[in-house]
Amino acid sequence: MIVRTTTEITDTDRDITSEDGNWRSKRIVLGGDRVGFSFHETTIKAGSVNEFHYANHVEAVWLVEGTGKLIDLDNNKEYDLAPGSMYLLNGHERHRVEPDTQMRMLCVFNPPVTGREVHDENGVYPLVEVPA
């Protein structure tokens, strides 16, 4: 059994802030935990514009705080987000998140991330194998 708190993760190598400071992700469960997924708490700043594309991962996102917009850049669709909203990027869609207020999201990635991935110039995380 693994038990962790976001308090103990804060300011460790599991606590990642984007280069532009727009978002912060606390990686609670990672690939090294060997459970087949990773689980993150991500906070995105109000008024920011954030473009992502997870070409190598499926991501499920559940919004627990805040409001804003999700723009599906592949299908030219826009969605309003509020607490209780969930979106699943099962088609590896390029997307943009535009918070009206600070958003706090709980995110699951499959395959799991290792924790040190950095978005490339296209917003993509590389697929990193977890060492045996």
From Swiss-Prot:
SUPFAM superfamilies: RmlC-like cupins. One of its GO terms (molecular function) is ectoine synthase activity. It is an enzyme of class 4 (lyase). Its EC number is 4.2.1.108. One of its GO terms (biological process) is ectoine biosynthetic process. InterPro entries: Ectoine_synth (IPR010462), RmlC-like_jellyroll (IPR014710), RmlC_Cupin_sf (IPR011051). The keyword Iron does not apply. It comes from the Bacteria. Gene3D superfamilies: Jelly Rolls. Keywords: Lyase. It catalyses: (2S)-4-acetamido-2-aminobutanoate = L-ectoine + H2O. It holds the Pfam family Ectoine_synth. Pathway: Amine and polyamine biosynthesis; ectoine biosynthesis; L-ectoine from L-aspartate 4-semialdehyde: step 3/3. Belongs to the ectoine synthase family. Catalyzes the circularization of gamma-N-acetyl-alpha,gamma-diaminobutyric acid (ADABA) to ectoine (1,4,5,6-tetrahydro-2-methyl-4-pyrimidine carboxylic acid), which is an excellent osmoprotectant. This is L-ectoine synthase. It comes from Rhodococcus erythropolis (strain PR4 / NBRC 100887).
